[in-house]
C-alpha cells in the first residue's frame, strides 16, 4: 500500500465503487436515490490500476471477475473517468506529478479533450506526453517568443525558428500555430499532432 500522500497530485481523490452486478440494476437517470450498495475508496493508497482493482475485488469478493464501476468521484478531474471506470493514467499522474503542476496538466488534458471531442482515443493523458509537450509558463506570447529566440533548440518545436527574430516569429503563421497556451498562468504546450 502506498501511503506518502504529501507528494501526490491528487492526495484527497476518492471514488464511489459499486459491484458490476449492482451497477447493472441501477437507473443512472435517477438522481434522487442515494445508492448504498457501494463504498468510497481513497485513491492515494493504490499505486496502480491493478492494485486498485485487487482492493475492489476484496471488497466485493463475489464479483472479482469483472472490475467494479464507479458512480461518483471527489477531488479529481472528471477526465480521469471513462464509461464508469477509472483510467489507468490516473495512478501514474497521481504518483509522479507534483501538485504545483496539476493546473498545467489539467489545462493540457482539457484542451485535448475539447479538440478530440468525439474521438477521445487520440487524447493522451500519460505523464510522458505531458512533459514532452510542456513548454513552460510565460507572461504572454511575446515573452514566449523572446525565450524561443534566445534558445530555439531547447524548445524542439515543429517549426524551424533558428535565426528568426522575435518579430519574425510573431508574424509567422507556422510559428503561431505550433503551440497552444492558456490557463491561469499562461501554460504553453506544443500542439499535439493535430
Q: What is each residue range found by the language model?
A:
Residues 1-59:
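N-terminal ordered "arm"
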Residues 36, 116, 134, 161, ...:
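Intrinsically disordered, low-complexity segments enriched in small/polar residues
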Residues 3-13, 29, 149-194:
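Acidic, proline/glycine-rich low-complexity IDRs
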Residues 23-36, 64, 115-122, 168:
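Intrinsically disordered, low-complexity coil segments
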Residues 53-151:
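Mixed-charge (acidic/basic) macromolecular-recognition segments
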Residues 40, 44-46, 108, 131, ...:
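A residue-identity detector for tryptophan
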